[in-house]
Amino acid sequence: TISLFLAQKAKQVYGVEIVPPAIDDARENAQLNGIENAQFFVGKSEEILPKYYKDYEEQHGGEKAHADVIVVDPPRKGCDAKLLDTILKMQPERIVYVSCDSATLARDLKILCEGAQEDEKTAGYQIEKWRAVDQFPMTTHVETVCLMSRVEGK
């Protein structure tokens, strides 16, 4: 549902989900709503995005894949290191991180804020806004949404 909402404002949207029926539903909803600028992939983000990045570079003569905005909504374990590394390489202007676990959110935000350590030209990110959302009242669970923007000239 995040991808379909974003498709209303974006030139192109790619959605990745590990649950095949969720992708089937997304494709059906896109078709029902006349959304043609969204593509969906079944698999783990930490496998799909690095492969997309590598394939894009090979198919475009070394040109790096780029995204204006990347939205992640990982499971409680947070984002895999390969996924975070690829996001940093793609250098989107903004990252929206939706989290259901504050500990893994803090861990991943630290990595994104520091940027890639081996490449000093790769910028890190700063948190612009964040909001805690109590989607599950009367429980200990809270969702957190963070908007991050790229810091130039690390």
Language model segments and positions:
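Rossmann-like S-adenosyl-L-methionine
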Residues: 1-154
